[in-house]
Amino acid sequence: HTVGFMQLSAIAAMTFMNPEVRGANWIEGVLEYASISRRGLEAIAELDGLTLDYDLHLPEPTKQPWETSGLEKLLVDIARLPVSSAFEDWERDLLGAIPQFLLNYTRYRDWFERETIHEIGQLVGERFEDLSAADAALSNVIADGDADRDEALVRLLHKRSLRLSMIIAGTDPDDENPLFHKLDPILE
């Protein structure tokens, strides 16, 4: 039940990212999606007796002068916004967290997509031009329900969610960072 709840929670977190939902917290949706997805996959791995790879490291950031300059300017301007009873500090901080995430994503997107495309290609035995095509193939593999691929799927999806967490945090996995917190074992 715990694993099922966590996976449904990850899906629900996506609703926070809908820009049309009044009161939705976009950045919280991103954070929850990454961390809950990863934790759910860790729980599945525990139940199945799988060992997961945490030895991932961010590469040197890619230089994207236009995106970097624009997002940094947005961060500076958001930090200067006056606060009031109608727009409090925490709301300004949440607003600023969006371009901060996008800045990190801009820096590491090529790595994230390259690694994910490569791993999906290894799983399905094909080469893909972009992440969209790789994800479509991955969706087909999942829909096929071939239990022989479950172990590889758990490992692939865990690495993907761990990479996203790394991008959000701007760091390698760190046990001191709540984003990388591992849940207590389910089976104990």
Give names to the regions the model predicted.
Residues 1-18, 174-186:
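Ordered, small/hydrophobic-rich secondary-structure cores
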Residues 4-66:
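ATP/Mg2+ or Mg2+-diphosphate-binding catalytic cores
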Residues 68-97, 102-188:
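C-terminal amphipathic alpha-helical interaction region
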